[in-house]
A protein has these predicted regions:
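Structural signature of tandem-repeat unit edges
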Residues: 1-27, 31-45, 55-70, 81-94
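Leucine-rich solenoid repeat scaffolds
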Residues: 70-134
């Protein structure tokens, strides 16, 4: 995969990357892996298709995300069929009615079960917790 594709915002195939190029000289990967713990989302308004088609994504930690300014989250999690764990923080709220949480039942750390029909879910907003797919 070429870096230009990522820089131009067209990285919907990153989840299917099979053979990265140019890593033969790499020695320190400590800051290279995709982590969102330091993302500042306080001024973000559009999260449409943010993780769209990330089929290999198994765990998503959004505990530091502030979605209070977000007005669009359409298809944000569409086709994330491999996602088994979703970590949400007290400032995370789902927006709209087409954010596409994978079809399943989800259990939080208290044992409460929430449903997703593949489009929306009844996972509560602004409730910090870890949700696991059943």
């Amino acid at each position: 995969m070429k870096q230009e594709r990522i820089r131009n915002g067209r990285c919907n195939r990153v989840a299917r990357l099979e053979k990265p190029d140019g890593l033969s000289e790499a020695r320190d990967f400590s800051h290279e892996f995709f982590t969102m713990s330091s993302f500042d989302t306080a001024n973000v308004t559009n999260m449409n298709k943010m993780w769209y088609n990330c089929r290999s994504l198994t765990r998503l930690d959004l505990s530091n995300f502030d979605t209070s300014g977000v007005t669009g989250m359409d298809c944000a999690f569409y086709a994330c069929h491999g996602m088994n764990t979703l970590v949400l923080g007290e400032k995370f709220a789902f927006v709209g009615n087409t954010y596409s949480i994978p079809l399943s039942r989800w259990k939080n750390s208290k044992g409460e079960v929430f449903d997703s029909d593949g489009t929306v879910s009844n996972i509560p907003d602004n409730a910090a917790d870890v949700y696991s797919k059943l």
